[in-house]
């Protein structure tokens, strides 16, 4: 009986030192940012920490060790992180990382930081004292480790079930899906910084993953189908291409009603082509570079590759929401295609999946989509993308300063004709019944390159879907036009035109 009471007392004493024991209140942290000029922030100072009421706050520091020279990267406040609990000193324990990271609790605890890797040494054997141990000592030495271990396991299990881990994966049993391509993402500090865009299915954040910026597209749980569709497209063999958005990971965060679905991709600071054209006028060479790399990306997406770089068969994929908002720009203005939430794959012997007719952005819908007269075959969907490409090429031309003449403010296709928020009926009237297209300005046609590009645009948005050019042909055309205008002749060029209305156009090429 006395042994049972002793065990109970030990357990109670251990439980009394629960998770709140040793917690230090964190209100302010030392702040430092090595990239302060680029990010337009303060370089150093004190940061006041703010967070949710029931969450703990910490300080952190990150630095590099370049051959013994310490290079401080960042300091500041850190969100609720189990790895930082009850740490009064900022100590990094990883053996030899690229970037050292530590976190702690308590005001200004990150003022000093150190690296102390875990060392596994020989086991220390406790030698009992020479006198014969009493029954009490035997019970304490036997039961105390068991009690501590049991409480630690229970505590860890309770915290796993009742808190939303800030940097870990959360699994949903009914749809485990394929494993994420980058399992280390959940082990690295990922911090959301600012919202960059809001779209049909959620918002896009700029985030920091260690020293790199990434984009995090967050879907609410009710848009799970769109998240799954885009994840499946990204996981298709052969989707790694310089003109397709780089995929990093797909994750599920939170539990129950707080569940969020994340897609983590490369971040491009220049944003979308729409945003760039709103604020910038482009040169002839810049126009050619954006247009050629954009066509190259769509051509590769449309291509069926039997054996792609050892990854397997890459099927033809139709984008189905091609527009300037879904074309991102790298720092050198190389185009990158993004947003594959509505994309559909065409695999031999398999149905293409969800192929509802009227999907995408109304303004960029082809005539056959607006009419609801779609042939649900692969070629028909690829030609729909090509109509939209014609509109995006027109947007590029409208902001080019290649010739003398005014460069108008940026406008969306058909904005001049039917405004910024056209209805489906407005577009049916203009595009289908009147067969109108965005207008070419007279002074554009005085430039030999722009004049040829206008011919190519007309062949992209042709009312007859079967007469539209393929993306691969557009890529070749633009390369030839650029060489011609820049002084390199080519026998394969389409004829230079001086007017779109009174010229014999070259034979129109099918999109296949």
Curated annotation (Swiss-Prot):
It comes from the Eukaryota. Disulfide bonds join 29-59, 49-77, 84-103, 90-102, 104-109. Residues 190-478 form the Protein kinase domain. GO terms for molecular function: activin binding; activin receptor activity; ATP binding; metal ion binding. One of its GO terms (biological process) is cell population proliferation. Residues 25-137 are extracellular. InterPro entries: Activin_recp, Kinase-like_dom_sf, Prot_kinase_dom, Ser/Thr_kinase_AS, Snake_toxin-like_sf, TGFB_receptor. It catalyses: L-threonyl-[receptor-protein] + ATP = O-phospho-L-threonyl-[receptor-protein] + ADP + H(+); L-seryl-[receptor-protein] + ATP = O-phospho-L-seryl-[receptor-protein] + ADP + H(+). Glycans are attached at residues 42, 65. Residues 1-24 form the signal peptide. Its EC number is 2.7.11.30. GO terms for cellular component: activin receptor complex; basal part of cell; plasma membrane. CDD domains: STKc_ACVR2b, TFP_LU_ECD_ACVR2B. Its cofactor is Mg(2+); Mn(2+). It is a single-pass type I membrane protein. Residues 159-512 are cytoplasmic. Keywords: ATP-binding, Disulfide bond, Glycoprotein, Kinase, Magnesium, Manganese, Membrane, Metal-binding, Nucleotide-binding, Receptor, Serine/threonine-protein kinase, Signal, Transferase, Transmembrane, Transmembrane helix. It is found in: Membrane. The keyword Mitochondrion does not apply. Not expressed in hen anterior pituitary during the ovulatory cycle but expressed in the ovarian follicle. The chain crosses the membrane at residues 138-158. The active site is at residue 321. Belongs to the protein kinase superfamily. TKL Ser/Thr protein kinase family. TGFB receptor subfamily. This is Activin receptor type-2B. It comes from Gallus gallus (Chicken).
